[in-house]
């Protein structure tokens, strides 16, 4: 008689309604005001994910901010370890799609409402399998982590009446009276896509930027070249001067060419060293020239392979149609396209009359 009978509710979804005193929020959504006032409403709204009624919270993060509210229930937020408002990860402050790509362990909710509610209840009873208990550290994810809150995300919207020159509120208007330039590609974001981590526009933009940065780091060399080395400059002096930019892997000295090559553990350290001493370095009375050593793999990737013309006939017979190379051009004063070491044709041999002369 506790669950049914006299304990009948008007809405069947309210039989297992959520009763919470505080929301699960990130530092950005909570705002910079330490004395924020939160309005609590029991059974105020329906969760955008599981469609269950939950305790709704509403507050104003700052003086020039707009009112924010919770859009998903606490149960769905705990399963994915996300904020109830922006649906960003609480630990890394990143979209779910970015986090799941590096952790390679995503939690997928069933599409059916009954199965989804049962799955959420089981996950709430055993929270050890959720993201909240994950202690796995990913280096790429730590680099993408947003360490400082971004309060500009809470700013008010632009006043539509101000755009029409008809706003009569003046300074009391809670909306902005200035234009802000936002990325139009982020205007069609979806709450469900953000939560499930599928087709998230913002996450795809972050991953694309991360991939471009990694490609630039791979193409950039981690070695610098120092020219003008003399006997007054020792290897210890060079190491003492360049170790502040990063971890040095190896140092190679070529006394014949008066050069020295320093290899760092990453390309960023080599770039810092070359930018610091791009105008030259004076060490022990010796003027040194420092520049970044080019990456041969990156510079030669567009060059064509060298063709061996020693066995030209055999090469043409064995060459596949896909392998097409530009022919070798010879100067106008030498029209003979044969290799110097190849045997001459019979027509090129001198005649008997020429041999008698």
Swiss-Prot record:
Q: Some GO term, biological process aspect, for this entry: which one?
A: mRNA processing
Keyword Nucleus recorded: yes
Q: One GO CC annotation, please?
A: U2-type catalytic step 2 spliceosome
Q: Where, by residue number, does the polypeptide cross the bilayer?
A: none
Stretches assigned to the RRM domain: 222-295
Give the ZnF (C3H1-type) ranges.
153-180
Highest taxon of the source?
Eukaryota
In biotechnology, this protein is used as follows:
Possible candidate for an effective malaria vaccine as determined by epitope response in sera.
Keywords, sorted A to Z:
Merozoite, Metal-binding, mRNA processing, mRNA splicing, Nucleus, RNA-binding, Spliceosome, Zinc, Zinc-finger
| MF terms in GO | pre-mRNA binding; U6 snRNA binding; zinc ion binding
Q: What is known of its domains?
A: The C-terminal RRM domain and the zinc finger motif are necessary for RNA-binding.
Q: What does this protein do?
A: Involved in pre-mRNA splicing. Binds RNA.
Q: What is this protein called?
A: Pre-mRNA-splicing factor RBM22 homolog
**Source species taxonomy:** Eukaryota, Sar, Alveolata, Apicomplexa, Aconoidasida
Q: Gene symbol? A: RBM22
